[in-house]
């Protein structure tokens, strides 16, 4: 086991809405010590009963240890003509097992999001990350628990909600790989039947690639076109991610 159990417990204690945001991406469990990363994400889609939602973010991440990667983001959200909302996000990823030591690699993600330009609740997320391989196929599946916390002193209580991510990737060559991605939310984590109105799922084809540019530097990309179902999920979502690693 790569990460001491103490860190696993602390991470779970620090962090505890089921809708998959238009710029969400599939988390990977692996961590590379010393790696620095500038990360840009973008997503856009229109839910059945709402206006177009556009989300973009810019972040900087660092592989602080062999098992811990930390990243800070600034995120901008726009919905129709209602103006922009700016959020700050702190993401921490922990690699729990040595890569390839067991048939399934495992990690843990924790994330805290706070409003910057407007009042609103904080959000926290935590969940296990899984990855396995069959020949040139790479499979990922993540289970996430999310909760909002009131920041205005109103004492508003929010439920803990469950969401998921999955990805299938065929590693054709380093510069171009293809597959599919899926995101979804089930509503309250312990009351899926009563949360049917909040349930939403999206799935679609995806492409991936990595271009080495020398001296441990690389540019990575992935993008997907997702088809959604549910009252809160856009019928079609375009999402993309561009990373510069150095």
What are these regions (language model features)?
Residues 1-26:
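Cleavable N-terminal export/targeting peptides
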Residues 19-246:
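Transmembrane beta-barrel domains of Gram-negative outer membranes and organellar outer membranes
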